[in-house]
């Protein structure tokens, strides 16, 4: 059993707790997406394990357009041998989740969404420089439940 993790290094803003590689500038977006697809092509050569899970993390994968995300997914599905019931997860920020974004994700092969809530306490969210508040977090979870059966949320402890 093998899995793929793809790091999408773009964010709208910098969250104070985050130590992952990301950029709030998207000046090189096309080049980065081209490089991701080239790396997929390279890694697939001679890779014989069957892929059971694909995880898009970040950064913020939902910053990508439907076309950009689907291009990457289609490339993976063409280049790698994947399980029939593969789990494909996309991380999302609550402020990115609209009905149209959730609909597009659920109509693709994405079958799990992981929402970066981090906290339901507005004071903590503000201190982390998160773009959403607790009401938006709850609303995003409620909306996601209409489109996905498999949902997880990230919560930071001990803030």
Task: Report residues per predicted region.
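Conserved non-cysteine loop/helix-boundary elements of the Radical SAM core domain that shape
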Residues: 22-46, 51-159
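Canonical Radical SAM [4Fe-4S] cluster-binding loop centered on the CxxxCxxC motif
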Residues: 1-31, 126
């Amino acid at each position: 059993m093998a899995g793929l993790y793809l790091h999408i290094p773009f964010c709208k803003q910098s969250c104070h707790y985050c130590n992952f590689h990301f950029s709030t500038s998207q000046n090189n977006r096309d080049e980065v997406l081209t490089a991701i697809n080239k790396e997929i092509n390279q890694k697939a050569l001679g890779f014989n394990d069957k892929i059971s899970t694909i995880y898009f993390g970040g950064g913020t994968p939902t910053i990508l357009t439907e076309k950009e995300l689907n291009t990457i997914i289609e490339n993976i599905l063409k280049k790698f041998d994947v399980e029939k019931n593969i789990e494909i997860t996309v991380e999302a920020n609550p402020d990115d989740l609209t009905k149209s974004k959730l609909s597009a994700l659920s109509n693709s092969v994405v079958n799990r969404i992981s929402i970066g809530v981090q906290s339901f306490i507005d004071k903590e969210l503000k201190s982390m420089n998160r773009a959403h508040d607790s009401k938006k977090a709850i609303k995003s979870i409620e909306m996601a439940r209409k489109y996905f059966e498999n949902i997880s949320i990230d919560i930071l402890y001990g803030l």
